[in-house]
Amino acid sequence: MKNYYSTVNNVILTHSDMLLENHARRVYVRFERQNDHGFDFAEGLLPENTFTKTYGFSEDELFELQDYLRCNAPLIWEFAQEGGGMFAKSAA
């Protein structure tokens, strides 16, 4: 699953290629940031735009990450169909 998408405020977003599971197209996503003891993370799915596992992010931060994911979903879908990496971007 390691197609890099972006880094914003030291939070990295990676995603899988597009997968076909039970006749449905899905993309797995993972947000992560380094902390003093390892990593905070939030793992989820598109098109559901939901998180399945989280650790270390506050509820407000998770809301912001979910909003970021919703706003960027069309690009992530496109990149996931094309294999991701070469289209990735970085923002400070």
Regions found by a protein language model. Name each.
Residues 3, 39-42, 63, 90-92:
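Structured catalytic/translocation cores of nucleotide/phosphate-coupled proteins
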Residues 55-92:
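Acidic, low-complexity intrinsically disordered segments
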Residues 2-3, 26, 66:
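Intrinsically disordered, low-complexity segments enriched in small/polar residues
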Residues 1-16:
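Negatively charged, low-complexity tracts enriched in Asp/Glu with abundant Ser/Thr
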